[in-house]
Amino acid sequence: MRERFRRARVARLATVGEDGKPHLVPVCFELAGDRVVSVVDAKPKRTGELRRLANIRAHPSVTLLVDEYDDDWTRLWWVRADGLARVVETGADRDDAVAALTAKYPQYEAQPPGGPVVEVTVHGWVGWAYLEG
């Protein structure tokens, strides 16, 4: 299950705002043990004040979902990671996360991410695959 999660190229990060409304965004990520990291990178954003960061600061419980769809339904699967997130602005934890993300996504070599890191400590894994029942 974790290996499928780790190999995925994009996850959906679900957070909850102070108003109780869910917020879902696609993110690049890396998995290291029970920690999932993502970074606010240089891709264009509508605003510098990202809702996901405000939501995490207000309510740190998050979910990350990766999945595979195929018209051959025997290839379908999904993995969900539930955990507690924190926003890491500076320091060794941020630097280590960016290095791990750069190893997975070479695009970051040309455009080094300058934003904060979202670090999720996973406390629950759930998944399903057609061939595994």
What spans do the regions from the language model cover?
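Short beta-strand segments
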Residues: 8-45, 64-67, 77
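A short, structured loop/turn motif at beta-sheet edges
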Residues: 32, 56-58, 88-92
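Residue-level preference for short coil/turn positions at secondary-structure junctions
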Residues: 6, 32, 58-60, 113
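Generic structural signal for secondary-structure transition and capping sites
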Residues: 9-10, 61, 106, 125
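Active-site-adjacent structural patch at catalytic or cofactor/ligand-binding sites
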Residues: 58-67, 79-84
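Charged, gly/pro-rich active-site loop segments
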Residues: 47, 72-133
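Conserved functional hotspots at enzyme active or ligand-binding sites that engage polyanionic ligands
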Residues: 1-10, 15-18, 38-58, 118, ...
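Short secondary-structure boundary/capping segments
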Residues: 2-3, 28, 54, 70, ...
